[in-house]
From Swiss-Prot:
It catalyses: UDP-N-acetyl-alpha-D-muramate + NADP(+) = UDP-N-acetyl-3-O-(1-carboxyvinyl)-alpha-D-glucosamine + NADPH + H(+). InterPro entries: FAD-bd_PCMH (IPR016166), FAD-bd_PCMH-like_sf (IPR036318), FAD-bd_PCMH_sub1 (IPR016167), FAD-bd_PCMH_sub2 (IPR016169), MurB (IPR003170), MurB_C (IPR011601), MurB_C_sf (IPR036635), Oxid_FAD_bind_N (IPR006094). Signal peptide: none annotated. GO terms for cellular component: cytosol. The gene is murB. This is UDP-N-acetylenolpyruvoylglucosamine reductase. It comes from Solibacter usitatus (strain Ellin6076). Its cofactor is FAD. Its EC number is 1.3.1.98. It comes from the Bacteria. Pathway: Cell wall biogenesis; peptidoglycan biosynthesis.
Length: 312
């Protein structure tokens, strides 16, 4: 595979993917390439295909669980973190840190993202998974998404993105790679927006300290309308928030809090927070996830669904 001649592409060999995941877990990639340039990214993908090399695309690595064996092939990281604004429209590169986008908008008095403060990861992943908090999701502000479908660069408008709760069309087409997103904001008062985000960030950092090796919540919450009626009837009314039941409630009922296996822990204060306490492995993390899924299935007859993605 010929990568050396591609401009604006940094390439390394036998790169530990644990350096690029929030869990701090994962074996080496045979080859690791990083770029902020769309042309270099597409050239790297083409080179891998021509040589028959397996390829994986990553971003901030917040929601990735990488095998202890790593990845046999090429890992490409698209890291364009450009942010720009024109009136009430903001364009964000997929490699921009979501919090940086929020700060950028708040500082300019652009309202609409302030409640997403503290959600880890990059903009591309936030759009991909329709990240949200406090009753709001990033999709509310997305006007258009620019992406690579494997052969050409395309632009989808909001409707074409098919957003739903923690879902988008990009989740169903994992070979489509988001390059950037255009967002439409409302006019607001910068100081008020910054205070709102600061308050939310303080609460989130108490639950998910920035230094903690975790992906935030592991499992998706449930829409109360999608639960079987007998199960929905078991949920206390005060647990349901904005039509959703926290996965943590089900996990708490099956004894998740404080669970330990090897270097992996479930927080004793939050049943949906699994973290690497130091020397945890992907095998141990997957074992804990599987155990919790099995307990909820046996007790309630429902499936808790991961927000994380598996590699290798």
């Amino acid at each position: 595979m010929r990568l050396a001649g591609i401009p604006n592409l940094a390439v390394s060999a036998s790169t530990p993917l644990s350096l690029y995941t929030r869990f701090g877990i994962g074996g080496p990639a045979d080859l690791f390439a990083e770029t902020r340039d769309e042309g270099a990214f597409m050239a790297a993908i083409a080179a891998a295909r021509e040589s028959g090399t397996a390829v994986m695309v990553t971003g901030g690595g917040t929601n990735l669980i990488v095998s202890d064996a790593g990845f046999r092939g090429l890992v490409v990281r698209f890291a364009d973190d450009t942010l720009s604004a024109e009136a009430e429209r903001v364009t964000a590169g997929a490699g921009a840190v979501l919090q940086d986008l929020i700060d950028f908008a708040n500082h300019r008095g652009l309202k609409g993202l302030e409640t997403l403060a503290g959600i880890p990861g990059w903009v591309g992943a936030a759009v991909y998974g329709n990240a949200g908090a406090y009753g709001h999701s990033i999709s509310e502000r997305v006007r258009a998404v620019r992406f690579f479908d494997g052969s050409a660069v395309r632009i989808f408008d909001h409707a074409q993105c098919e957003f739903a709760y923690r879902e988008s069309i990009f989740k169903r087409h994992k070979d489509w790679i988001i390059f950037s997103a255009e967002l439409v904001m409302d006019a607001g008062e910068a100081g008020e927006l910054e205070r709102t985000s600061a308050d939310i960030l303080k609460v989130r950092n108490e639950k998910f300290p920035p230094t903690m090796k975790c992906a935030g919540s592991i499992f998706k919450n449930f829409l109360i309308t999608e639960l079987p009626p007998p199960v929905a009837g078991l949920v206390p009314a005060n647990v349901v928030r904005e039509g959703k039941v926290p996965a943590a409630w089900f996990l708490e009922q099956v004894g998740a809090k404080g669970m330990r296996f090897g270097g992996i822990r479930v927080a004793d204060y939050h049943a949906n927070l699994i973290y690497n306490a130091g020397e945890g492995t992907a095998r141990e993390l997957c074992a804990v996830i599987a155990e919790l899924k099995g307990r909820v299935r046996e007790r309630f007859g429902i499936e808790v669904e991961e927000e994380v993605q598996y590699v290798g």
